[in-house]
Structures are given as structure tokens and as C-alpha cells.
Amino acid sequence: MPSALSMRPWDAALPNTTAAAWTNGSVPEMPLFHHFARLDEELQATFPSLWQALMVVHGTIFLAGLVLNGLALYVFCCRTRAKTPSVTYTINLVVTDLLVGLSLPTRFAVFYGARGCLRCAFPHVLGYFLNMHCSILFLTCICVDRYLAIVQPEGSRRWRQPACAKAVCIFVWLAAGVVTLSVLGVKSGGRSCCRVFALTVLEFLLPLLVISVFTGRIMCALSRPGLLRQGRQRRVRAMQLLLTVLVIFLVCFTPFHARQVAVALWPNVPKHTSLVAYHVAVTLSSLNSCMDPIVYCFITSGFQATVRGLFYQRGEEFKPSSMDVVSMHKSTKASAPIHILSIGSHTLTQPLTNGPEP
């Protein structure tokens, strides 16, 4: 059994005072990044079976996320002509999910090829948490945009311009970068509770509150009498989107932030408990990259039809080529809204019960 005083690979990269703190048995004060960078090795050494199981799960998440989000990126960038604010936010969300997935192979490479090297671990740790925070903020942007488009269509028209959406996306990336660096720079072992609470409120509880409030507002709007059938259906669709995002928040992001707050409040929590909780929470947050494609189905009315059109050929009636472009518009001659898919020289029509997305 190795001695508690033995030097570990990452200790060489830490100041002498930090190494001395480890040898004295106390928790050293160092940035959270240093802790995150070595937790993979600690889990593998302490619970090798759990480590192997989680690596299999992460590998599955990587493959599924790469396929689903790669397909979504192609559909929204190449097959969707109308770049509404929701589509703009969704494209950025897809990019963050792809980067989260791509960070997993980097994690394996660092663990097996550069174990204990803090410089090698920094890109993976920074990229992972940056994209997690971006996912939270872009999901919030999508929900706010859907609420404004459905419940406040006239008053919000000024704020739902493409230029405004692009500016919001730039701000989100910058804000996520600042929050990520702040989180990774928090000193553990000291009085870090206030800073951890502030960051948790800023980048998790506040977005969760926004989504919860807007979901309640749409539910109240649905209860109003006299709504037209089309208006009610569009509000139901928006509520389904908000509820889906709310579930993703609770399942994927709550465990990680709850663990961070718990460790800050109770620094003497058993080390093995904290270690397992961290890795389970990180796995659930990675699962977000596979759950977000559910959200895409509510962004535009034609997303599901477009995806089906890419995979299913219907004889001579449905033969897409590499140059095909899917377009959506509303027929003015029909008695009901019609969803028209223009695919090469062929045209398919189907009722668009939810109406065109604003």
C-alpha cells in the first residue's frame, strides 16, 4: 500500500508549500483546476471498475453525440434557409455539444499519454467547463426567444433581429469564458464558499429561474379563454420546449452544481464520496450533448421532416440529392397552413398544424 507521504505526479507541478500541505495531511489551498486535473487518476486508482464503466459510458456519449449533433449542425446550417434567432442560438448550442463530445477523447489521451501533466490537462478541463456553461446559457437563450416569439410577438420584434441574436451569442461565449476561468481559479481548502455560491447563482440558478418562470407564464397563457386553435397549438409547442429544457437542466446540470456547493459547505466530506459524486455528476453533464437533440425537434416545425427526408427514400417520389435544399413556407391558396418540402425537382406537402415558426 503506497504511503500517504509519497510524491504524486501532479505534486511536482505544485509549489513547495502546496506539497508540504499534502504531507501534513491537510487540504492544500490551490485552484480547483489542480483538483479537477487529477481526479481521473484518483478514481482509476481507488475504484478501477467504476472508472472502466464510466469510460464506456463516456465513449458511448461521444459516439452518439457526434452523430446526433453532426446531423443537427448539417440540417440547421445547410438545410434551413430561415436563420431565425432560435436557429442561431441552436447552431451555437450544437457547436458547444460537439465540443463537449470532442473533449472526451482528449480526456482519454491526457490520462493515458500525459498523466499528471497540468499543462496537458488544462485544454481539456477548460474546454469541458467552458462548453458546459455555454450549453446552459444557450438553452436559456432559446427558451427566452421562444417565450418572446409566442407570448409577446409584437413587443419583442425589435429584440428578435438576426443581428441582435448574433450579438447575444458573442456575449454568451465571452461570459461563459469569464465564469469558467473564475470557477477554475477558486482556491479550495480556504474560505471559498461565498465565491462558489455566487458563481452557482450566476451560471446555474439564475438560468434555471428564468426557464421556470417562463414555463409558468406560458402555462398561464394557455389557460386564457378565447385562444385560436393555431395560437394554442403554438403555445403548447413552446411549453413542450421549455419543459424539455427544464428536465435537461435538472438531470444534467443539477448534480454537478449541488456537489460543488456541498464540497464548499462541508470541506470535510469523505474523500471517496466526493470523488464518486464528481465523476457521476460530470458524466450526467456530458449526457446533455445527447439530450439536446430532443430540443431541436421543437425549434422549427420542419426539423423532424427534414431529418426523415435525409434517411428515407420513397421511391421515385422522394429521391434527395447532394444539391437539394429544404425550404419551408406557408401556402396562401390552401384553406389550412401547408408545410412544403422542396427537394430537387420533387415537392412534398403536409399539413403544418403548428404553423410556421416566427
UniProtKB/Swiss-Prot annotation:
Extracellular topological intervals: 1-46, 106-123, 189-195, 259-274
UniProt keyword Membrane present: yes
Membrane association type: Multi-pass membrane protein
Tell me the PROSITE patterns matching this sequence: G_PROTEIN_RECEP_F1_1 (PS00237), G_PROTEIN_RECEP_F1_2 (PS50262)
Q: Write down any Gene Ontology CC term.
A: plasma membrane
Glycosylation site residues: 16, 24
Gene3D superfamilies hit by this protein: Rhodopsin 7-helix transmembrane proteins
Compartment(s) of residence: Cell membrane
Give the Cytoplasmic compartment stretches of this protein. Answer: 68-84, 145-166, 217-237, 296-358
> What does the tissue specificity note say?
Ubiquitous expressed with abundant expression in intestinal tissues.
Spell out the family assignment given in the record's similarity comment: Belongs to the G-protein coupled receptor 1 family.
Function of the protein = Orphan receptor with constitutive G(i) signaling activity that activate cyclic AMP.
Write down what this protein is called: G-protein coupled receptor 20
- Which species expresses this protein natively? Mus musculus (Mouse)
